[in-house]
């Protein structure tokens, strides 16, 4: 990282657990972004943290188990911290601080691994990266029917941090990163570009996607990643504008036909 760069400053930082690390600020000119007509779509979600149009995915089950473990420990320590002797309460508060640091570092480590793998694949295949604009992703996933535990898991995951890691790693690697609007990405069939004709209904059911128009059937997150890749092609390929027109027309038809069906 320091090779070929110009260090500007260094800061010694003390963690809550008493350990230290050093932050070094360097100045490095990023390489020119590679010209390409290939796009890798990345779908971020609650079941798979990330799923790409290349078929790579990072399942969230193991990560959910780790976060649930931290949550249970936190609950036990919080209960103990509210009663007992003064020294035991202080000890519990110290353990809670250490636990918080471990969970935060775990999330950072996972997001670094995911972002590094995605950018490396894009660099190797001379592709750009497309992902949804994450503004409001936490609100959107929480609108879906889930248990209290599932909502807590989504709220605890650093989606925005993952996007930041992807952005800076892509910039350093000379890989273009494209943000696309999230509307209908999970409901559109990547093969025929159709969405369910009835408002409020979708061809997606959990992890499965079955198109009622062309018959394509497969993993819903893979389908979403492919749609995101197609939307990302708007920037790099002339055919992209046609995709937007297709989705816009279907959206308009659903909006105009809905009152007739309910009349």
Locate predicted features.
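Positively charged, helix-rich recognition surfaces that bind polyanionic ligands
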Residues: 2-6, 14-263
